[in-house]
Design a protein with these regions (language model features):
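Short glycine/threonine-rich loop-to-helix capping motif typified by GTGT followed
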Residues: 109-120, 146-163, 182-188
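Condensing-enzyme catalytic core mediating Claisen C-C bond formation in acyl metabolism
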Residues: 57, 61-133, 137-140
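A glycine- and small-aliphatic-rich helix-loop capping segment at beta-alpha/alpha-beta transitions
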Residues: 25-28, 48-59, 118-122, 154-166
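Active-site-proximal alpha-helical scaffold in enzymes
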Residues: 5-37, 74-94, 181-188
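Short pre-catalytic strand/loop immediately N-terminal to key active-site residues, enriched for Gly-Thr
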Residues: 3-11, 66-70, 170-182
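Conserved small-residue
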Residues: 15, 22, 51, 82, ...
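Acidic, glycine-rich active-site loops and adjacent beta-strand->loop/helix elements
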Residues: 10-14, 38-43, 102-107, 145-147, ...
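Stable alpha-helical structural segments in soluble proteins, enriched in small hydrophobic residues
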Residues: 18, 123-131, 158, 162
Length: 188
């Protein structure tokens, strides 16, 4: 491992931003392969108390987009991906599992637990534009879906703004119901 190496620290977006940067480096030709991902372990007294202080923690389970949701649950975990230029992967006989077509990054510094619809919409619109695909080509969204009323409602409104009538055809879920909110490792 001798290519670009750096750490990204942007809260819940850290691993997504790290993967976007790895994708951009491969796409630019700076490196044919990048290893990227994210991890987080905040299941300690201070970490739990900090989120409890924000009053966003569930008493029992994380249920993103459910009428019975009552907050998030912390988790810990990690994920690592290999981003590789397609011809380079084929030349070495690698099994290509998926393709990343595009990405976007935005900033939404208004509130840590009350995201803005505009910020989420800009990110989705930018990703569609960068990928060069129409919104009707999207069939599934793995949403941030924290299980808090504020986040879930805002995300749904942003999806409706970006995808219009196609939003009714989309499958949307959040894996946080299975592993909790992994903070910086969430995207990986």
């Amino acid at each position: 491992l001798r290519g670009p190496s750096f750490t990204v620290s942007t809260a819940c977006a850290s691993s997504n931003h790290a993967m976007a940067q790895a994708f951009a480096i491969v796409r630019s030709g700076m490196s044919p392969v990048m290893v990227t991902g994210g991890s987080e372990s905040m299941l300690c007294f201070g970490g739990v108390k900090a989120w409890e202080g924000l009053r966003v923690m569930s008493r029992d389970a994380c249920r993103p987009f459910s009428a019975n949701r009552n907050g998030m649950v912390q988790g810990e975990g990690a994920g690592v991906f290999v981003f590789e230029e397609y011809e380079h992967a084929c030349a070495r006989g690698a099994e290509v599992l998926c393709e990343v077509a595009g990405f976007a990054m935005t900033s939404d510094a208004s509130d840590i637990v009350m995201p803005s619809k505009a910020g989420a919409a800009r990110a989705m619109q930018g990703a569609l534009q960068d990928a060069g695909i129409n919104r009707e080509e999207v069939g599934y969204i793995n949403a941030h879906g924290t299980g808090t009323a504020a986040n879930d409602k805002t995300e749904c409104a942003a999806v409706a703004d970006v995808f219009g009538t196609h939003a009714d055809q989309l499958m949307i879920s959040s894996t946080k119901s299975m592993h909790g909110h992994v903070i910086g490792g969430t995207g990986a």
